Amino acid sequence: MDLVQIGSYTFSSRLILGTGKFGNTASMVDAVRASGTELVTVALRRFNREETDHDLFTTLADLDGITLMPNTSGASNAKEAVRAAHISRELSGSPFIKVEIHPNPQHLMPDPIETYEACKILAGEGFLVMPYIPADPVLAKRLEDVGCASVMPLGSSIGSGQGLATAGMIRLIIRESTIPVIVDAGLRSPSEACAAMEMGCTAVLVNSAIAVAQNPPEMAAAFAEAVQAGYRAKAAGIMPKSGSAIATSPLTSFLDTTS
């Protein structure tokens, strides 16, 4: 696959992993390795200065070829997200920040207004900002305009496993964006990740579907293969749909004779 460029960074994998919900750290590390990912997201609250054995920042940073993308999960407004980003950069040394602002725990939908305000500040401060957003083409373009490194529209609600419920809006975002479009949240199966790539997404971020699988490393590998397949299919040129049948070979020419 072609390299993915986000800011000044390049990655060969188009699968990004979340690190929540895993039963234990060993399972998470095994899944990260099996996925071939090079970019993982981790919440600030997973940093533990006192107990380094339970500190995911250190655990993940020690893995070869892994770049950390801290996230602001838990922030309920722009001010909290900006503060979390500053602390995360100090602790991790990473310029990446995934802006997540979902103040209502009942549905965990991202707040578009607070997200925009936080992104405008953080992009101005030199962060590589990757916001988690509703599948809203207007918002996505506004975030591109203020300097975000990518946009991450949801496929469906966090952890719901409802797949690409917002596919139509994601297609519009892809069509209008000049920065990477990464589907985040709601993917349940590798086939859905493949479908996202066939649509033209730059990458996908997966957490729950891998973390809660009976065999997380095997599921991570399956997602990696699906992402590659979807990307290759899109690049190869997918057959257009037709409203009627089209013969794959001539229906009458075999009746013609020259003798």
From Swiss-Prot:
Main localization, broad class: cytoplasm
Positions of 1-deoxy-D-xylulose 5-phosphate binding: 159, 185-186, 207-208
Entry keyword Membrane: no
SUPFAM superfamilies assigned to the protein according to its UniProt record, in alphabetical order: ThiG-like
Pathway: Cofactor biosynthesis; thiamine diphosphate biosynthesis
Subcellular localization, as worded in the UniProt entry: Cytoplasm
Function: Catalyzes the rearrangement of 1-deoxy-D-xylulose 5-phosphate (DXP) to produce the thiazole phosphate moiety of thiamine. Sulfur is provided by the thiocarboxylate moiety of the carrier protein ThiS. In vitro, sulfur can be provided by H(2)S.
Listed name of the protein: Thiazole synthase
Organism: Chlorobium phaeobacteroides (strain BS1)
Taxonomic lineage: Bacteria, Pseudomonadati, Chlorobiota, Chlorobiia, Chlorobiales
The encoding gene: thiG
